[in-house]
């Protein structure tokens, strides 16, 4: 019997086909687009500062431009370039969102919902990305995508333990948050969210507070209740910068080790615990590789000589 396709699987297939047509960005393109986004974000921050100084009154474009030292035309040009750059960076990396989302399937959420949450996380990553740091955007964005998805899973686990009428209201609030985020290109404020839902800001705040009661990290989630919530949320990297630095360092170390012969690489990995954190003696390595202790020493010496010559590739990590 032929397998019946569901509407959801059709939507996913169509979505994947569409995003697959968007070309990936080169590192040089990421730098150019990233700088445009950062210029636009600084103008946005300036606007928020002016707004708070004026008692939440929205500054006019003329006031905004004057505070930025720009003409109205220059301000609008910066806005156009910034929003266009942000859109390009998001669209070129949607395949990464799908890749991360697939790792969290069977966690009480559909793939499309996971993709949507991951995309919102990536939008935040685009806004925070500093292209002058030298790393690729995809490495940096991975942290933001994963954080958004795991938080969404935690929220879902939390809301299914609330009364149904509160859960329904929270679902509406979440849906409107997504819509406004896509329309505005940023996270909606509480008053904007309340107005769109025909609620008062106090009511929206109250519903959101109800969804924030503590959850045990031992809580089991997933279709088969086979994963603890803490397993999804725990990470050794507390910031996207730390995650990116570690990922970049691993990649550069792997590239460095690729300059060694297979046997040299094995010796270094075992001698310094690169595989499992357990260092081994020369004799133990010799037994493992079925070569003499002296041959192990020779391979180690040759490998270290090669690595010292190429250490400039990881010098920045050693300095930091």
Swiss-Prot record:
One of its GO terms (molecular function) is sigma factor activity. Residues 168-243 are annotated as: Sigma-70 factor domain-3. Residues 256-310 are annotated as: Sigma-70 factor domain-4. Residues 282-301 bind DNA. Pfam families: Sigma70_r1_2 (PF00140), Sigma70_r2 (PF04542), Sigma70_r3 (PF04539), Sigma70_r4 (PF04545). One of its GO terms (cellular component) is cytoplasm. Disulfide bonds: none annotated. It comes from the Bacteria. It is found in: Cytoplasm. One of its GO terms (biological process) is DNA-templated transcription initiation. Keywords: Cytoplasm, DNA-binding, Sigma factor, Transcription, Transcription regulation. A motif (Interaction with polymerase core subunit RpoC) lies at residues 113-116. InterPro entries: RNA_pol_sigma-70_dom, RNA_pol_sigma70, RNA_pol_sigma70_r1_2, RNA_pol_sigma70_r2, RNA_pol_sigma70_r3, RNA_pol_sigma70_r4, RNA_pol_sigma_r2, RNA_pol_sigma_r3/r4-like. SUPFAM superfamilies: Sigma2 domain of RNA polymerase sigma factors, Sigma3 and sigma4 domains of RNA polymerase sigma factors. Residues 89-159 are annotated as: Sigma-70 factor domain-2. Sigma factors are initiation factors that promote the attachment of RNA polymerase to specific initiation sites and are then released. Belongs to the sigma-70 factor family. This is RNA polymerase sigma factor SigA3.
């Amino acid at each position: 019997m032929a397998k019946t396709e569901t509407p959801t699987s059709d939507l996913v297939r169509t979505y994947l086909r569409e995003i697959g047509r968007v070309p990936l960005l080169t590192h040089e393109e990421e730098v150019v687009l990233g700088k445009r986004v950062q210029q636009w974000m600084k103008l946005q921050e300036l606007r928020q500062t002016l707004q708070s100084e004026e008692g939440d009154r929205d500054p006019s474009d003329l006031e905004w431009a004057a505070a930025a030292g720009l003409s109205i035309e220059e301000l609008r040009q910066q806005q156009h370039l910034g929003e266009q750059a942000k859109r390009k960076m998001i669209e070129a990396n949607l395949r990464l969102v799908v890749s991360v989302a697939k790792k969290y399937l069977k966690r009480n959420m559909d793939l499309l919902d996971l993709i949507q949450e991951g995309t919102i996380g990536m939008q935040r990553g685009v806004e925070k990305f500093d292209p002058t740091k030298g790393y690729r955007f995809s490495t940096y964005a991975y942290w933001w995508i994963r954080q958004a998805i795991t938080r969404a899973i935690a929220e879902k686990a939390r809301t299914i333990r609330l009364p149904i009428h509160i859960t329904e209201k929270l679902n509406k609030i979440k849906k409107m948050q997504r819509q406004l985020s896509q329309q505005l290109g940023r996270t909606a404020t509480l008053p904007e969210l309340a107005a769109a839902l025909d609620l008062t800001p106090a009511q929206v705040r109250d519903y959101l507070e109800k969804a924030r009661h503590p959850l045990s990290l031992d809580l089991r989630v997933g279709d088969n209740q086979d994963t603890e919530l803490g397993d999804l949320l725990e990470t050794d990297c507390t910031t996207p910068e730390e995650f990116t630095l570690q990922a970049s360092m691993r990649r550069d170390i792997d590239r460095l080790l690729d300059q060694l012969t297979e046997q040299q690489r094995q010796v270094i990995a075992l001698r310094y615990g690169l595989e499992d954190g357990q260092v081994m003696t020369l004799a133990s390595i010799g037994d493992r590789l079925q070569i003499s202790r002296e041959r192990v020493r020779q391979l180690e010496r040759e490998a270290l000589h090669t690595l010292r010559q190429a250490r400039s590739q990881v010098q920045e990590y050693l300095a930091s």
